[in-house]
Every structure is written in C-alpha cells, then in structure tokens.
Amino acid sequence: LGDVYKRQPLMVGEGTEPVGRVCLGTVKGDMHDIGKNLVRIMMEGSGIEVFDLGVDTSAEQFVSTAVENHCGVIACSSLLTTTMEEMREVVKLVHERGLQDQIKVMVGGAPISQSFCDEIGADYYAEDAGAAAREAVKILKVQKAS
C-alpha cells in the first residue's frame, strides 16, 4: 500500500506565530491517551505548538523534551489513581533542575483535583481539555511578554 502517514488538520494558519510551546504527555505507567489527545487538539486549535510525548512518559522525558524545545509548559495527564503520583516526580525534577521560573507544570485527568495539584506543588490544574488550553495560552502569553 505504500507509505502510510497520518494527516494532521490545519489548526492554525500557516505562517502564524505560535502562542508558545507545550510539552504534553500521559505519565509513566499510564497508557490512556484519549484525554491527552483532546488536550492536544484544543491547544493546537488555540495556536500552541505541542510536543506530544504520548503515553507512559517519564519525568525525565517530560523535562528534557521541554528544555530541548523551549517549552514554557509541561502538561501531564493521568487517568489512573495508581499513576498520578508520577506527576509529583515531574514537579520535583523541574525544581531540582532550577527550571521552575521558565517551565510551569500543569496537571489534569479524571482523578486529579486542585487539591492534588496544590499538594504536589504543580503550578496549574486543568479540569478539562478546554481549561487546559485556555490556561496554557494565558501562561505562555505572560512568559512571552516578560
């Protein structure tokens, strides 16, 4: 059948400057991606360049990809209560590397709450894909202005 490729919809006009960059993924141990994919679509539709790491993403993968690609936000997704603690590792690594002023950590997913976000020291909680995109745009615009 020849080469198979995935066509991506044109979410933002060509030549348009992106609002900023986000590193997105589902945390280590979690193979669920429907929610993450919805977040990616909403973010791309809002003019954000998204680096989608897929599922089962380690803290090191999140942070190194964010640094290499100059992402202002790391957005972590989790569907399972057994994997939500991995988000704490992402926050911890961002702080260990002294990146907390350049990279903000956003968390979301079915078992995640504002209370959990506060407990692990993440910067932002998004209750759904639309909220994640809106919050990311705000964060990135502030970063771009400073």
Where are these regions (language model features)?
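Glycine/charge-rich, flexible interdomain linkers and switch-proximal surface loops
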Residues: M11-V27
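Short, small-residue-biased leader/transition segments that mark boundaries at the very start
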Residues: L1-Y5
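Cofactor-cradling patches in redox/metallo enzymes
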Residues: K36-S46, F51-A122, A131, E135-V137
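A structural signal for hydrophobic residues in beta-strands of small regulatory alpha/beta folds
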Residues: Y125-A126
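C-terminal helical cap(s) of enzyme catalytic domains, especially alpha/beta-barrels
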Residues: E135-S146
